[in-house]
Amino acid sequence: MYKFSYFTEEDKAKVIAFMQEYSFAVITGFGEQYPVATHIPLEIEIKENKIFLSGHIMKNTDHHKAFLKNENVLVIFNGPHCYVSASWYSGRGIASTWNYMTVHAKGKISFTQR
């Protein structure tokens, strides 16, 4: 993901609202040899000015085992996206692009015994 300052949302409330609206996210981690990922609906909660995500991951799967060994995760929330053709620009030498909205949240995963 390209991180240009003019595309970065600094308003924490807007970022949280985005995460809540597009809460079907991808949790990524690293297994024995390869990255692992799981798509999961998440609940977003704020406690003492910290963001907590909660959801359900089935036990004894490759991603559950990977997350037990390495608690560091990246959670990706994807929103609207669309192709932008170079022909839409008036200037020359402009390449086509893809506009999108996303949040990448880094943190640590923990499990309850429920």
Predicted regions and their residues:
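Binding-site signature for planar aromatic cofactors or substrates
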Residues: 1-114
